[in-house]
Regions:
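Solvent-exposed alpha-helical segments within well-ordered globular domains of core cellular machineries
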Residues: 4, 8-11, 20-23, 41-42, ...
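Conserved P-loop
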Residues: 83-161
Length: 251
């Protein structure tokens, strides 16, 4: 079996990581007089690295972050110095996911809630957790569509079982009439079973009016806050700062 045939056989065995680097590693083995066990170790490590990278890629794609580039490395904590940094970094360790706890990020628009939520989602993926991200109005629209096409049970199963569900921008857009009922069902089914991270620009006192069902909102908040971490963002807005800077530059 020559090199090309061997690479083809490796791919048939789903060992594409080894097939891709085989020629390079064989050349290295000859150049460095590597022992057979060292060569095999390198090839196995290459395959494991490739599989790990592809798994992370699939999980990021499944999470469907709105802004995949948002990470903690790109967040300026000095812009809002009163933000609880310790809580942010504690959440980024993802220990709250292992404990099946929840998180609630509150504050005006443009204060970094979505950035931090997605950054924590990225950290969770790096640590081996599955994540599902949706803006609140998109999530509820998809749930309504699932009712129409008969896939609500399957979609709800996804929402119930994913280790971290991020519901972003709650209260930013108009919500369907079934929003209170649907959100309460999601929260109840996930309570003490999986972690939910919710962001909102509306104070919790307004949620009853927003959803038109005070009882449902009370039940939902009771569960989120029972084992929940609350992060208050703001008051300064990045978008306001950017707009002011742009306007100043055009004067």
């Amino acid at each position: 079996m020559n090199l090309i045939e061997l690479q083809h056989a490796l791919r048939q065995l789903r060992l594409g990581g080894i097939a891709t680097v085989l020629e390079t590693r064989l050349h290295q083995a000859q150049t460095e007089a590597m022992a057979p066990i060292d060569l095999i170790s390198c090839l196995v490590a290459d395959e494991l690295t490739r599989r790990g990278d592809r798994l992370l890629e699939r999980r990021r794609k499944h999470a469907a972050f709105r802004d995949p580039q948002k990470t903690l490395d790109h967040f300026d904590f000095n812009f809002n110095p009163k933000m609880n940094r310790s809580l942010v970094f504690d959440l980024a360790t993802c220990s709250f996911i292992g404990k099946r706890e929840d998180a609630l990020f509150l504050g005006p628009g443009g204060t970094g809630k979505s950035h931090l939520a997605q950054a924590i989602g990225q950290a969770a993926i790096q640590q081996g957790y599955r994540v599902f991200y949706r803006e609140a109005h998109v999530l509820l629209d998809e749930l309504a569509e699932a009712v129409v096409d008969g896939t609500r049970k399957e979609f709800m199963e996804t929402l119930t079982t994913v280790p971290l569900l991020i519901i972003d921008d709650f209260g930013m857009r108009k919500l369907p009439l079934t929003a209170a009922e649907d959100l309460l069902e999601i929260v109840m089914r996930r309570y003490e079973r999986a972690s939910t991270l919710l962001t909102s620009n509306r104070p919790v006192e307004d949620w009853g009016k927003l959803l038109g069902d005070v009882a449902a909102v009370t039940a939902m908040l009771d569960r989120i806050l029972h084992h929940g971490h609350v992060l208050k963002c703001g008051p300064r807005s990045w978008r306001t700062k950017t707009a002011a800077t742009t306007a100043a530059g055009t004067v």
